[in-house]
């Protein structure tokens, strides 16, 4: 689910922390991708013209494999070395969110039964999309045949992606979930696995610039995320993004905010949830269950052409000519290796408050300018 309203806060207060770039800008980068989120996207977006999921004659869904194969190829074509991270066992605190999703699913199934209009049916069907263990297993098998490394995280995939980026194994974590920032990935890439047809630039969020711009510590930023609403516990009803940021800045921590509310100084406008496990949620962000990066060896291998054709073409009925063309692209891209970028020789220099304020003002002015060209950075 991510963090409600966090993207809006960053866009409003620190737009300079977000760089919109073409995929070519990440040539030579290694990136850790949230596999579960990507598979969900593929199941939602990769469809036939009538809106139905791609499938074999026997009814087996193949949208996830089509998306995984061709979106990964696009990255390889542009000099990116992807590795995928799959979710492990969800933390106990997440049962709160999983229960909510289960309840919503029951409601959606009812709406689907009642739907008469075809467009409404497709809308409700998309809401019922769920990544199954079979989808995950098939995606892992495909990645193995493609020669693309993958990891199964002990817990949350976003946390493991962030850890790989923090430890320098990869440049950035890629996910649509904004809570990846709470695990303090240096950079978060959004829209990386979107289709080329969408023409959506990749959004690169610099975590350090976000913290500087909001004038928050990492711990305070995590507390802000919990107040906005995360997967691990409910939020305080009635407190939206503007108020949440104001309270964190004024009081500095959730402990102080809870004390402020329960003392009656907030005029009883809000009520803290009973037995609110905000500290446990905080620890899941600050000290997540991840594999030590030193124990992970990311290696990109030559694709297994014969088995790829057998799996995708003979078993899943993909177009053989297109798959063979894709394999050639894969062989070429993986053979070339990761080229060294010139900016890799230079240490990142933190921006001063004045520089950050100037950049933020410039970014805000650009957003307000009419007749935007829509061009993205090529770096």
Curated annotation (Swiss-Prot):
Pfam families: XPG_I, XPG_N. Residues 364-379 have a biased composition (Basic residues). SUPFAM superfamilies: 5' to 3' exonuclease, C-terminal subdomain, PIN domain-like. Residues 120-251 are annotated as: I-domain. GO terms for biological process: base-excision repair; DNA replication, removal of RNA primer. Residues 1-105 are annotated as: N-domain. It comes from the Eukaryota. DNA binds at residues 47, 71, 156, 229, 231. Structure-specific nuclease with 5'-flap endonuclease and 5'-3' exonuclease activities involved in DNA replication and repair. During DNA replication, cleaves the 5'-overhanging flap structure that is generated by displacement synthesis when DNA polymerase encounters the 5'-end of a downstream Okazaki fragment. It enters the flap from the 5'-end and then tracks to cleave the flap base, leaving a nick for ligation. Also involved in the long patch base excision repair (LP-BER) pathway, by cleaving within the apurinic/apyrimidinic (AP) site-terminated flap. InterPro entries: 5-3_exonuclease_C_sf (IPR036279), Flap_endonuc (IPR023426), HhH2 (IPR008918), PIN-like_dom_sf (IPR029060), XPG-I_dom (IPR006086), XPG/Rad2 (IPR006084), XPG_CS (IPR019974), XPG_DNA_repair_N (IPR006085). One of its GO terms (molecular function) is magnesium ion binding. It is found in: Nucleus, Nucleolus; Nucleus, Nucleoplasm; Mitochondrion. Its EC number is 3.1.-.-. This is Flap endonuclease 1. One of its GO terms (cellular component) is mitochondrion. It comes from Zygosaccharomyces rouxii (strain ATCC 2623 / CBS 732 / NBRC 1130 / NCYC 568 / NRRL Y-229). Mg(2+) 2 binds at residues 177, 179, 231.
């Amino acid at each position: 689910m991510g963090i409600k309203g966090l993207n809006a806060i960053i866009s409003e207060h620190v737009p300079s922390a977000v760089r919109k770039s073409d995929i070519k800008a990440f040539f030579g980068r290694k990136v850790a991708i949230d596999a579960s989120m990507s598979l969900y996207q593929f199941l939602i977006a990769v469809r036939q013209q009538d809106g139905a999921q791609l499938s074999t004659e026997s009814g087996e869904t193949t949208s996830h494999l089509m998306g995984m194969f061709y979106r990964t190829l696009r990255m390889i074509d542009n000099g990116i070395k992807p590795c995928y991270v799959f979710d492990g066992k969800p933390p106990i605190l997440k049962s709160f969110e999983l229960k909510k999703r289960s309840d919503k699913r029951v409601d959606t199934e009812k709406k689907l039964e009642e739907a008469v209009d075809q467009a409404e049916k497709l809308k409700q069907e998309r809401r019922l999309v769920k990544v199954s263990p079979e989808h995950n297993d098939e995606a892992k098998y495909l990645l193995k045949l493609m020669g693309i490394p993958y990891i199964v995280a002990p817990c949350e995939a976003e946390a493991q992606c962030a850890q790989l980026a923090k430890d320098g194994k990869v440049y950035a974590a890629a996910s649509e979930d904004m809570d990846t920032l709470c695990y303090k990935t240096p950079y978060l890439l959004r829209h990386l696995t979107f289709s080329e047809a969408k023409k959506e630039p990749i959004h690169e969020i610099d975590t350090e610039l976000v913290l500087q711009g909001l004038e928050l510590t990492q711990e305070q930023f995590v507390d802000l995320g919990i107040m906005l609403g995360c997967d691990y516990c409910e939020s305080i009803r009635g407190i939206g993004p503007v108020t949440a940021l104001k309270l964190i800045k004024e009081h500095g921590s959730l402990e102080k905010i809870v004390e402020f509310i329960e003392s009656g100084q907030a005029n009883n406008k809000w009520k803290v949830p009973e037995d609110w496990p905000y500290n446990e949620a905080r620890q899941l962000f600050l000290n997540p269950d991840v594999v030590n990066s030193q124990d992970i060896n990311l290696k990109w291998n030559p694709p297994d052409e014969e088995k790829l054709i057998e799996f995708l073409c003979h078993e899943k009925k993909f177009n053989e000519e297109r798959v063979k063309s894709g394999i050639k692209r894969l062989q070429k891209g993986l053979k070339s290796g990761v080229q060294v970028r010139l900016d890799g020789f230079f240490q990142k220099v933190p921006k001063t408050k004045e520089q950050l304020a100037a950049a933020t003002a410039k970014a805000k002015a650009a957003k307000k300018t009419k007749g935007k060209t829509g061009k993205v950075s090529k770096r």
